[in-house]
């Protein structure tokens, strides 16, 4: 296999075959595998070496592809999940994963398989503790790890559990996951795994401040200086309502902020073009003038009225009120022999899925197609329609495989931004 790009040639073995790439030696190996070689079985979650989804084997050792520079591959023997199955037949390790249902959402599965394989290569009959240690660098949000550990132990012959026989049909019968095999082969398609070959890329510019006003200069000069940069989208480019939200009557989250940001990371502009060009333009190049304001850092300060409202449409910073009452609670309380009062609060809980929020959009005539990682395609359709100012039946949402969601992908993230870009640029 040989890929010609722009820099010096890097030669190595990939899944048993000679491979030669002409990449920048500091390019992430995860990008080389996914973008240049088309091996999207290696997943990218955190891009920082925390989640382990991108685990591959380099000379038999576990390595995070997102932290490994392409230049480090020179002369190495590299293995990815695509190399486990032979002639389309699952390896014993993959078969054990399938039998135990160890691949659930599937986003961590390639990393888990490679981590397990690295152990089995040197320790064919490991102990449970050794299996757990070998898998320790790969996070899983779905399984609780038990099925994964059991699958590795069975593949090694160390331990085997008696499982009910698979059945073709019948309520209550055990059957294997219908989408288990693609997840084990690394062929399941998630939001970041595919896009048309001629797609443009988007990079969103986000606020570095939790609260601020800002002025975004005219982008014409930046576009002139960067030929591969097609467009810089701002709030003025939103054809419909520049707001969305999960409440039907409240659409207060701007697609792109107008002149004020209300949280760190709020989108203020979107750069559209080829990948190299949009990555070359830094946030500082845009010349955004920021005026930081006092941030609301707790609900107490938000309700005290000493800081201006986050949204002018929400008086006293209250989004919604809840009320629940049934029966004569007061008299029952007074008649109770034992009374207790207290105040309780819970911490913020992150859904913690590893799958990235990603997708692509294409305008076809007067309709928009949006391929995206989502749990709620119909909610996405309605949100995108009102952002574009078109009818819902002009929007088609094509859900990708979802690498974890747990309710965290009920609301929109990249959907409005992709939709506006595709609709404007056609």
Residue ranges and their predicted role:
Residues 51-52, 200, 258, 355-360:
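Short glycine-rich loop/turn motifs
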